[in-house]
Amino acid sequence: MSNQWWDEWAEKCHSKAHRQLLFWRYLVKQTLLLVEDDKNLADGLLVSLEQAGYDCLHAETIADVKQHWDKADLVILDRQLPDGDSVQHLMDWKKIKDIPVILLTALVTVKDKVTGLDAGANDYLTKPFAEAELFARIRAQLRSPDSGQDDSKVVTSNLTIDKATREVFFNGESITLTRTEFDLLLFLASNLGRVFTRDELLDHVWGYNHFPTTRTVDTHVLQLRQKLPGLEIETLRGVGYKMKA
């Protein structure tokens, strides 16, 4: 893509929402550090996290954590590691880089939770756990104003959109979309439950209002439904579209 073409296109994108879409494409992909010595659990969780669009690092011991810490945007941290209790080192690690930490542990008492949170953890999830809950907690921490992280992905129960790489995963499978299909999907998924008229979608996604026909929106919605079967984009007759939460 030439710089001249990009500049001309960006000038047409007068709406704030569409300028944000352009900016999102340059955000850095988020990296998670999983600190877990249970090989089976770690292997399965790493696969799921990568399918959700995250880059992943893995450490099995306290000794391995320090070399990875400054590369991560969030840490999923087991407490009971082969070389000790990880929370005893948490304050020191956070001095290297203050990033969100989710403790994922079999220690379940109130005292255990208080100890972990007082040591600097941002969240505490006990084993056994549901992946969906862990992923929701990850998303919550990464979009928190206190995390200092860019929210470079849109994630729902079955959909992951990476704004930086323009990759889309639906039900764990990679989906190839055109540029406009991607922009439309990203906009709707970023505004779950909100209703938009066809003219509003033309403005936000295409970047200008004067387009030959609003049927263009209908065509692209149809293409998204065909490429992502089961995607819940609802048609409100006589009004427009919304994506269900």
Curated annotation (Swiss-Prot):
<keyword id="KW-0238">DNA-binding</keyword>
<dbReference type="InterPro" id="IPR016032">
    <property type="entry name" value="Sig_transdc_resp-reg_C-effctor"/>
</dbReference>
<dbReference type="GO" id="GO:0006355">
    <property type="term" value="P:regulation of DNA-templated transcription"/>
</dbReference>
<dbReference type="Pfam" id="PF00486">
    <property type="entry name" value="Trans_reg_C"/>
</dbReference>
<dbReference type="InterPro" id="IPR001867">
    <property type="entry name" value="OmpR/PhoB-type_DNA-bd"/>
</dbReference>
<comment type="function">
    <text>Member of the two-component regulatory system VxrB/VxrA involved in the regulation of diverses processes, including virulence, the type VI secretion system (T6SS) and biofilm formation. VxrB positively regulates the expression of the T6SS, a virulence nanomachine that directly translocates effectors into bacterial or host cells, thereby facilitating colonization by competing with sister cells and intestinal microbiota. In addition, it activates vpsL expression and biofilm formation, and represses motility.</text>
</comment>
<dbReference type="InterPro" id="IPR001789">
    <property type="entry name" value="Sig_transdc_resp-reg_receiver"/>
</dbReference>
<dbReference type="InterPro" id="IPR039420">
    <property type="entry name" value="WalR-like"/>
</dbReference>
<dbReference type="GO" id="GO:0000156">
    <property type="term" value="F:phosphorelay response regulator activity"/>
</dbReference>
<feature type="DNA-binding region" description="OmpR/PhoB-type">
    <location>
        <begin position="151"/>
        <end position="245"/>
    </location>
</feature>
<dbReference type="InterPro" id="IPR036388">
    <property type="entry name" value="WH-like_DNA-bd_sf"/>
</dbReference>
<dbReference type="GO" id="GO:0000976">
    <property type="term" value="F:transcription cis-regulatory region binding"/>
</dbReference>
<keyword id="KW-0597">Phosphoprotein</keyword>
<dbReference type="InterPro" id="IPR011006">
    <property type="entry name" value="CheY-like_superfamily"/>
</dbReference>
<feature type="modified residue" description="4-aspartylphosphate">
    <location>
        <position position="78"/>
    </location>
</feature>
<feature type="domain" description="Response regulatory">
    <location>
        <begin position="31"/>
        <end position="142"/>
    </location>
</feature>
<keyword id="KW-0902">Two-component regulatory system</keyword>
<dbReference type="GO" id="GO:0005829">
    <property type="term" value="C:cytosol"/>
</dbReference>
<protein>
    <recommendedName>
        <fullName>Transcriptional regulatory protein VxrB</fullName>
    </recommendedName>
</protein>
<dbReference type="Pfam" id="PF00072">
    <property type="entry name" value="Response_reg"/>
</dbReference>
<keyword id="KW-0804">Transcription</keyword>
<dbReference type="GO" id="GO:0032993">
    <property type="term" value="C:protein-DNA complex"/>
</dbReference>
<keyword id="KW-0010">Activator</keyword>
<keyword id="KW-0805">Transcription regulation</keyword>
<keyword id="KW-0963">Cytoplasm</keyword>
